[in-house]
């Protein structure tokens, strides 16, 4: 029967007058994943209608696999390219693209730099995105206002926290993530499960802050949420309840309980409304109940009038979906959508197109932020510098004052090969920090903070002082203790050789981090590549003896190690003389040693070898740029693969199976299924 009014005779209140702000409406919104292999097309969202308005906060709820994230991504314009969306998505009555500056999106994971304080995190983000025409005082005023708006005053000067330093709480981290997104004063704010992993108190404060943002700032706030507490649920103005991509209920959250009661599924007095809603539409409860019955051999309970005990969850869900389609709530939503579709103009809505900061301001800000992060993160460079110092003294004492005897030839070669090969290999230790930095980059890049070129340049500039320190410390200790060829110019070349070799390894690991964003697999991949480079450097097997096909040409020419070792040999041996193997024979020149014994060509200078390393460094940085750009284009294909895996997994879930039609309810109405809780929600029938 069609629902024309609520049980007490009241209808949902008439929609508010249309004023300033962003009015978002969607009509007959459908999202499908086409199966190009010939199988059936998967329908993720099925003909959804709804709207979100300024000054109100909407909750998108539903069981796992119901389409919450898909709906949120559809509204935010973040759908993968492998899916097809149909229907109308209107912004103030117009079909418009939801660009950066108009909308903001807060991800479920809080990706922040743990070494920065809350105030620093927000300040750097403000300088990256706000207009360069603003003075420093004006930017600081915006930052302080945002801190106050999110209630972060008490933790503003505490670090976010990472693996070696304790920081702010989970709720405070989430509010920091929200603060970063509202800096540009977006008109619409989307949030993906902002209370995930938070306790009830922290979740309440987060949603309360979002409600204040919506009401005080006149913004439109839409948030997906899984299973909020009753206190949190009461903070939401509107509710969009989904199940298997279909609308179970859309309207004001305070009328949802009445809707379920009218449909024959009243919420018990002592039960959280959100728990009751999900209990009615989540078919996984049937599986759990059946499993418990089978394992514990529970007897059949007596007949009861409780519909949750007499009906399968899929049947309850089908009835709710059908009742909503025929209800006054659905009619009210469609009527409001028609009103919003008639809006003309933007109604005072300010729209920003991309970041308003200049390229050079972004470069300066990113460089400073990255440098501060490197200084405070002991695992980024400081731990490696300590290890470099220790290893340098070990090398210096083992090869101390190596001399010019015949046996010193092998010692010099071994020492030079170890320094240019194994000591530069230690730069792989910064990979975990690379991974964390890349996460921040991907998140900020997706939100339109800055471009790829700015990030790559700022990363190298900020690391430059640390790389110089590593080269100078290692070069000074080993060069003077081993007593390589004397002379300031030779010492300078030795340090430059180390500097550019370490820079190449750093750049290589950045490429690996962009391709393999997993800590363990990235380390294995990077170590394997560096191992190949070392094998073709000419240290383990002389360059002339390498197989000509592939290993000599082109691998050894692409290996920084071969150029680094050749340059190191020339820098140390040329100009020196060594004692002969047998007494009475003439002394051996350094040129003879490296050319005849070690197969190093002396037709070009050591500076050419150093230039080759610099060229390889530039190539790695360019490759890093290309990989990041290509990943942006290839990401839809990767998401398509992930989507197929997700669909296969969801097909096995009872909650994802297609619900039966309403006409089929009578035939299976009295099956002896049992709910997990009684009507009062305090005890369980399973004893």
UniProtKB/Swiss-Prot annotation:
Polar residues bias (residue ranges): 674-687
One annotated Gene Ontology cellular component of this protein: plasma membrane
Effect of residue 171 to D: In cer5-1; accumulation of wax in epidermal cells cytoplasm, and reduction of cuticular wax deposition
Locations listed in the record: Cell membrane; Endoplasmic reticulum
Pfam family, one: ABC_tran
PROSITE patterns: ABC_TRANSPORTER_1, ABC_TRANSPORTER_2
Record's keyword terms, sorted: ATP-binding, Cell membrane, Endoplasmic reticulum, Lipid transport, Membrane, Nucleotide-binding, Phosphoprotein, Plant defense, Transmembrane, Transmembrane helix, Transport
Domain ABC transporter residue range list: 24-269
Family in the record: Belongs to the ABC transporter superfamily. ABCG family. Eye pigment precursor importer (TC 3.A.1.204) subfamily.
Role according to the record: Involved in the secretion of cuticular wax from epidermal cells to the cuticle, especially in the transport of aldehydes, alcohols and acids.
Protein name: ABC transporter G family member 12
Lineage, broadest ranks: Eukaryota, Viridiplantae, Streptophyta, Embryophyta, Tracheophyta
């Amino acid at each position: 029967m069609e629902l024309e009014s609520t049980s007490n005779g009241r209808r949902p209140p008439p929609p508010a007058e249309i004023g300033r702000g962003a009015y978002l409406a969607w009509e007959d919104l459908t999202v499908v994943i086409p199966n190009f292999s010939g199988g059936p097309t998967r329908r993720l969202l099925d003909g959804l209608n709804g709207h979100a308005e300024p000054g109100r906060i909407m909750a998108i709820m539903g069981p796992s696999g119901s389409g919450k994230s898909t709906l949120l991504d559809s509204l935010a314009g973040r759908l993968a390219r492998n899916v097809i969306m149909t229907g109308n998505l209107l912004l103030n009555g117009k079909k418009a693209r939801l660009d950066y500056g108009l909308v903001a999106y807060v991800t479920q994971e809080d990706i922040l730099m743990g070494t920065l304080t809350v105030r620093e995190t927000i300040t750097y983000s403000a300088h990256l995105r706000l207009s360069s025409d603003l003075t420093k005082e004006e930017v600081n005023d915006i930052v302080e206002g945002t801190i106050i708006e999110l209630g972060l005053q008490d933790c503003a000067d505490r670090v976010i926290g990472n693996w070696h330093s304790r920081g702010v709480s989970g709720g405070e981290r989430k509010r920091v993530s929200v603060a970063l997104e509202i800096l540009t004063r977006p008109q619409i704010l989307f949030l993906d499960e902002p209370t995930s992993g938070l306790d009830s108190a922290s979740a309440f404060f987060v949603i309360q802050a979002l409600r204040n943002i919506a009401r005080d700032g006149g913004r439109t706030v839409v948030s997906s949420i899984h299973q909020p507490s009753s206190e949190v649920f009461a903070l939401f103005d509107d509710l969009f309840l989904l199940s298997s991509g279909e609308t179970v209920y859309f309207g004001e959250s305070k009328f949802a309980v009445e809707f379920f009661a009218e449909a024959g599924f009243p919420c018990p007095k002592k039960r959280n409304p959100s728990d009751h809603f999900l209990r009615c539409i989540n078919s996984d409860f049937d599986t759990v109940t059946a499993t418990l019955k089978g394992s514990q051999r529970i007897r059949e309970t007596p007949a009861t009038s409780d519909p949750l005990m007499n009906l399968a969850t899929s049947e309850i869900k089908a009835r709710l979906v059908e009742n909503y389609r025929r209800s006054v709530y659905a009619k009210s939503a469609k009527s409001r959508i028609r009103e919003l579709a008639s809006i003309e103009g933007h109604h005072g809505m300010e729209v920003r197109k991309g970041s308003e900061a200049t390229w050079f301001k972004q470069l300066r800000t990113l460089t400073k932020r990255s440098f501060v992060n490197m200084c405070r993160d002991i695992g980024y460079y400081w731990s490696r510098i300590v290890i470099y110092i220790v290893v340098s003294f070990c090398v210096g004492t083992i090869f101390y004052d190596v001399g010019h005897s015949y046996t010193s030839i092998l010692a010099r070669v071994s020492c030079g090969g170890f320094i240019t090969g194994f000591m530069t290999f230690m730069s792989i230790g910064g990979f975990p920090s690379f991974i964390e930095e890349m996460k921040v980059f991907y998140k900020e890049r997706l939100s339109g903070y800055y471009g790829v070129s700015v990030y790559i340049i700022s990363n190298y500039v900020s690391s430059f002082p640390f790389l110089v320190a590593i080269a100078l410390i290692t070069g000074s200790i080993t060069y003077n203790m081993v007593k390589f060829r004397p002379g300031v110019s030779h010492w300078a070349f030795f340090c430059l050789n180390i500097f550019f070799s370490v820079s190449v390894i750093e750049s290589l690991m950045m490429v690996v981090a962009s391709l393999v964003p997993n800590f363990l697999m990235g380390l294995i991949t990077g170590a394997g590549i560096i191992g190949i480079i070392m094998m073709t450097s000419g240290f383990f097997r002389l360059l002339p003896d390498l197989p000509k096909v592939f290993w000599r040409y082109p691998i050894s020419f692409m290996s920084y190690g071969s150029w680094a070792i050749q340059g190191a040999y020339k820098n140390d041996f040329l100009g020196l003389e060594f004692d002969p193997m047998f007494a009475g024979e003439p002394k051996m020149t350094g040129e003879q040693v490296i050319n005849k014994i070690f197969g190093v060509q002396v037709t070009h200078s050591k500076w050419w070898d150093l230039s080759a390393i610099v060229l390889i460094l530039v190539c790695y940085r360019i490759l890093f740029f290309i990989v990041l750009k290509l990943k942006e284009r290839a990401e839809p294909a990767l998401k398509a693969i992930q989507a197929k895996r997700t669909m296969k997994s969801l097909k096995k879930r009872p909650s994802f199976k297609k619900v039966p039609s309403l006409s089929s309810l009578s035939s299976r109405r009295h099956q002896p299924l049992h709910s997990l809780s009684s009507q009062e929600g305090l005890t369980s029938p399973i004893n």
